Structures are given as C-alpha cells and as structure tokens.
Amino acid sequence: NSPDEVLSWLEQVDPTRIVLALDVRLDVAGVPMLTTHGWQQTSGVVLWAAVERFLRSGLTHVLCTDVARDGALTGPNCELYAEAVRRFPELQWQASGGVATARDLVALRDCGVAAVISGKALLENKISSQELRPFLPNASSLASM
C-alpha cells in the first residue's frame, strides 16, 4: 500500500534478493488489478503498471497471487501468468492461487513461470511427493516424506 516505501527498500538493499508480492483480482474486463487490505479493496492500480514502476529499481522476482483462486483448488490462472511472462520476460515470476494437481505445475512451468506457491493442494495431499519430484532440484530429500 506504500509503493514509495518499497522503492526505497529496493534502493537500500540488493533488489535481486527481494520478492515483490502482489495480489490481484481480475476486473470485469479481465484486467489484473492490485488488491489491498486483506484482498478486501481494489487499489485501482493495474498489475502491469505496478510492475513497470518497480522494474526500474532492479527488481528481478515477483510473486503474483490471483486472489479469486487462492485456496480454491480450481486450477491456476495460466492466462494471467503467461501474459506476465510475455510482458516482463526478464523477471522471475512466482505463481500463486488455484494450484490443485501436478498438471497445474506442468501448465505453469510450460507458460514460463519460475516458481509456484502451493498451500492447500499440499496440505490436503492433492499432489503426492512422487508427483513433485520432477520439479525439485533436490528430489532425493523427499525420500523421507
């Protein structure tokens, strides 16, 4: 809710070590708008404009949550993330919201997302450790799961 403050942080530290987390809700035209106040309010700021502003400071990582899908296990908004990667290929995008199956992980990887946040699907064992192995660089550590 304080972009100038975040920009000052990016100036004070190595911006490649910060992940900018942005929550969005699609408006009626399908435009991703930033949400605030625990997702209760839409800020009136378009995701793409916000990212552009922070990009100039050396930002390299963005976590984007589609709040309409978060915790719903309805599948991720691959169109949103593919558009994000298309618009800003220099960024490492992290997708959050809606992941329900290993197929969702494949779909997000295929659209260019660098990382995925999955909570409910893992907590409810919708994705097995065996299904996760291809996505983890240290998969041998899963042997104890």
Which residues make up each language-model segment?
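C-terminal helical cap(s) of enzyme catalytic domains, especially alpha/beta-barrels
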Residues: 6-12, 106-145
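Charged helix-capping and loop-helix junction motifs
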Residues: 43-48, 74-82, 133
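Short, well-ordered secondary-structure micro-motifs
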Residues: 30-37, 73-76, 105-107, 128-129
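Secondary-structure boundary/capping motif
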Residues: 1-2, 72-76, 124
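Conserved anion-binding
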Residues: 1-70
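Glycine- and other small-residue-rich loops at beta-strand/loop junctions that grip anionic moieties
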Residues: 65, 70-73, 94-98, 120-121
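Catalytic cores of alpha/beta
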Residues: 1-10, 79-118
